């Protein structure tokens, strides 16, 4: 009795102080958990504010009703009274006493009917939340605890709010838990089925009796095991539909990988078969038997053509060999790329097609129906380009070791081929190539900038590496013909170093800020010559200006082109945009001045310094904005932001050029000299070093320049608008 008394006492004094918010929560909770009274819920609602947490606690069993366990025997007195009313659902309202009587009742009819009805309407909805029995019942007689999934103890109240709550639950929960592709159909079906069920159950409740028990167990177990949480009638349907949706693509995806990609005719047959099957399967989605047969047919059909394919492989390879023979007549080098590309095409195109098969069946025809030869030209364009780049550094080596008479007839052919390839490349490939080329061919570009007429023709020369090599082949005979034969060996050696350096730094571009510890210790990166390299290269770009040692002021940044026009006045209009564009390639990330080791160590080679301009953790490695160099170079214009680009950089480097040319030119170098057109002497060893240095430096600079351009134009990339010296930010780290 003590518990009874406590309960009623608690009831009376708590109902007075209920505020409306608590009351609404308790109402919703009693609808969700019909066997919990408001008395049971009051404490929980007062303890936890949030409805969701309360529901979680109750469903997970973390919270249990305090009085439930203690008096099982008392409640049995009430069962016989309640059983008389149990069949009339309209009068049957949620009531804790009823609930307990049902648990312990021995009358199988009343028990099964309530169990049947409640489990359909309610526990199916609860199962969506994957609920275990909410609390530990110790009454010995309730049957269903061992199922673990649904709670038997709920009485049926078919009041409208209750049914509405259930249907709302199913509406929200079905799409989350059901794994089918047909969520929307299922929602509609689930709702209809539930409404129908509730009506039927109200009518048929009294008639159904024991049969219900068996049916219910049979139906519920599969739906529980598959976690299909829709109601009974709709539970098998999603299973069938999802089974069809899952089963039909599988044979396609598996068979596709087996069949070789070259056999276009066979693939077309397969595609037509698959389309037919898709139409069948769409027509017969509800009819499972037809689905199964079509899936089997499909497996057989896809199995047959793949076998035929494997038989037909040798024939098709024969055809491809003929096509390749035709290609050999046109261009010799394309033979290699074509073969490599076909191999790569198998690797590249196979996974793509596999994916398209699974996702959208119809698109396969678009992908496959192109003949593989076209794909060899169109699909992996960037790969073709990379192969070209790897071949071409080797070609100049061979050509320059040959006598010059052989060299010149080969050039027109090679340039033809390169122009063809340039036409093939899509814009993406060019964009990708741009990074690699810029770094690879700096030296040749310097030479090209002397030939202003050619600049006019190829203003976009640094977009296509192939053309640069072609032009280099054209230009080299001119200086070479003025030289003794002994000059060829250092130049071919220089080309070899070009290739080696390119491969050495090849991956620098992909991880712009990354470098490995020994990077600057290598022979290829000569610190002693860096000033000379800078000087020489910029001397070439800026024409004769620095030969006469006049300093170019800030306003004269454009005078690079003016100086170049002393030698070739004709091309002034063409040259000025081209050189202006060419300038940022040479710009140095650390503000024009060239500190050999430390600047590299911090600004360049560590992952912190480079590409992120000013993310908070990296301040120590960046020089502050306002006077960028810590030490002032000759002109006080260093205050610009680091990559302000063309003007500032060309200035600084030209000052250094002018100083170093004063040192170099009086000393007149004894080695054989390449006479550039502007008459400036360049020693081949220096050329080698320019090249290696610039290839590396440019890859670093492109990343830096991109980041800096984004940062300086106010793109929000990191913190970069931060003023390190202002009073506000003084105590920042």
UniProtKB/Swiss-Prot annotation:
Recruits the ubiquitination machinery to RNA polymerase II for polyubiquitination, removal and degradation, when the transcription-coupled repair (TCR) factor RAD26 fails to efficiently displace stalled RNA polymerase II. Also involved in telomere length regulation. Binds DNA. The modification Phosphothreonine is found at residue 337. Belongs to the DEF1 family. Residues 495-525 are annotated as: Contains the proteolytic activation cleavage site. Residues 21-63 form the CUE domain. Keywords: Chromosome, Cytoplasm, DNA damage, DNA repair, DNA-binding, Nucleus, Phosphoprotein, Telomere, Ubl conjugation, Ubl conjugation pathway. This is RNA polymerase II degradation factor 1. Residues 297-327, 336-357 have a biased composition (Acidic residues). The keyword Ligase does not apply. Residues 103-121, 222-240, 380-446, 465-495, 655-677 have a biased composition (Low complexity). One of its GO terms (molecular function) is ubiquitin binding. GO terms for biological process: DNA repair. The keyword Cell membrane does not apply. It is found in: Cytoplasm; Nucleus; Chromosome, Telomere. Its main location: cytoplasm. Residues 69-446, 465-498, 635-682 are annotated as: Disordered. Residues 69-84, 210-219, 255-290 have a biased composition (Basic and acidic residues). GO terms for cellular component: chromosome, telomeric region; cytoplasm; nucleus. Homodimer; may form higher order oligomers. Interacts with the large RNA polymerase II subunit RPO21; the interaction is direct and serves to bridge RPO21 to the Elongin complex in a manner dependent on transcription stress. Interacts with RAD26.
């Amino acid at each position: 009795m003590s518990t009874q008394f406590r309960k009623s006492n608690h009831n009376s004094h708590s109902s007075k102080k209920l505020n409306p918010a608590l009351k609404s929560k308790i109402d919703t909770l009693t609808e969700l958990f019909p066997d919990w009274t408001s008395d049971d819920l009051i404490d929980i609602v007062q303890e936890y504010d949030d409805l969701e947490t309360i529901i979680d606690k109750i469903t997970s069993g973390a919270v249990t009703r305090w009085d439930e366990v203690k008096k099982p025997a008392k409640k049995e007195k009430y069962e016989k009274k309640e059983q008389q009313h149990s069949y009339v659902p309209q009068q049957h309202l949620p009531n804790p006493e009823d609930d307990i009587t049902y648990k312990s009742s021995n009358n199988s009819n009343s028990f099964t009917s309530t169990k049947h009805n409640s489990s359909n309407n309610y526990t199916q909805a609860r199962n969506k939340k994957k609920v275990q029995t909410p609390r530990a019942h110790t009454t010995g007689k309730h049957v269903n605890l061992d199922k673990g999934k649904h709670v038997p103890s709920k009485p049926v109240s078919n009041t409208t709010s209750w049914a509405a709550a259930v249907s709302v639950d199913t509406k929200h929960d079905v799409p989350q838990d059901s794994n089918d592709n047909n969520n929307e159909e299922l929602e509609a079906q689930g709702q209809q089925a539930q409404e129908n069920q509730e009506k039927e159950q109200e009518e048929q409740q009294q008639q159904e009796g024991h049969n219900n028990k068996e049916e219910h167990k049979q139906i519920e177990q599969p739906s529980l095991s598959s976690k299909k949480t829709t109601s009974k009638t709709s539970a098998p349907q999603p299973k069938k539909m999802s089974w069809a949706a899952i089963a039909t693509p599988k044979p396609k995806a598996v068979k596709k990988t087996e069949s070789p990609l070259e056999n276009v005719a066979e693939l077309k047959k397969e595609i037509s078969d698959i389309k037919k099957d898709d139409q069948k399967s769409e027509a017969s989605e509800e009819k499972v038997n037809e689905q199964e047969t079509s899936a089997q047919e499909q497996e057989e059909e896809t199995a047959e053509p793949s076998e035929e394919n494997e038989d037909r492989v040798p024939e098709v390879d024969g055809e491809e060999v003929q096509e390749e023979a035709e290609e050999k007549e046109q261009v010799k080098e394309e033979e290699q790329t074509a073969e490599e590309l076909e191999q790569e095409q198998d690797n590249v195109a196979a996974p793509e097609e596999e994916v398209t098969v699974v996702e959208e069946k119809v698109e396969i025809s678009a992908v496959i129906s192109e003949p593989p030869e076209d794909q060899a030209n169109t699909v992996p364009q960037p790969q073709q380009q990379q192969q070209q780049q790897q071949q071409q550094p080797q070609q100049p080596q061979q050509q320059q070791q040959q006598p010059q008479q052989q060299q010149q007839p080969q050039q027109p052919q090679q340039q033809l081929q390169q122009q063809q390839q340039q036409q093939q490349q899509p814009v993406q490939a060019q964009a990708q190539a741009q990074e690699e080329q810029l770094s690879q061919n700096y030296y040749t570009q310097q030479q090209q900038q002397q030939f202003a007429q050619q600049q006019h023709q190829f203003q976009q020369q640094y977009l296509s590496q192939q053309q640069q090599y072609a032009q280099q082949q054209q230009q080299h005979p001119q200086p070479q013909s003025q030289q003794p034969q002994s000059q060829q060996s250092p130049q071919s050696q220089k080309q070899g170093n070009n290739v080696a350096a390119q491969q050495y730094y090849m991956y620098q571009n992909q991880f712009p800020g990354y470098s490995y510890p020994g990077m600057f210790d290598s022979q290829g990166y000569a610190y002693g010559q860096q000033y000379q390299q800078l000087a020489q290269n910029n001397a070439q770009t800026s024409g004769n200006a620095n030969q006469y040692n006049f300093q170019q002021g800030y306003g004269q940044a454009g005078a690079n082109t003016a100086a170049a026009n002393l030698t070739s006045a004709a091309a002034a209009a063409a040259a000025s945009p081209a050189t202006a564009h060419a300038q940022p390639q040479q710009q140095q990330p650390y503000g024009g001045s060239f500190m050999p080791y430390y600047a590299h160590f911090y600004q360049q080679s560590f992952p912190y310094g480079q590409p992120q301009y000013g993310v908070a953790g990296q301040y120590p490695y960046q020089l502050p904005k306002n006077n960028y160099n810590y030490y002032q170079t000759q002109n006080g214009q260093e205050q610009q932001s680091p990559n302000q680009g063309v003007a500032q950089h060309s200035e600084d480097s030209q000052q250094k050029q002018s100083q170093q040319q004063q040192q170099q030119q009086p000393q007149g170098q004894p080695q054989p000299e390449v006479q550039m057109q502007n008459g400036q002497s360049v020693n081949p060893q220096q050329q080698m070093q320019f090249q290696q240095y610039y290839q590396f430096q440019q890859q670093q600079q492109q990343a830096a320049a991109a980041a800096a351009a984004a940062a300086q134009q106010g793109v929000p990339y990191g913190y970069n608008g931060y003023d390190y010296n202002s009073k506000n930010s003084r105590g920042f780290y």
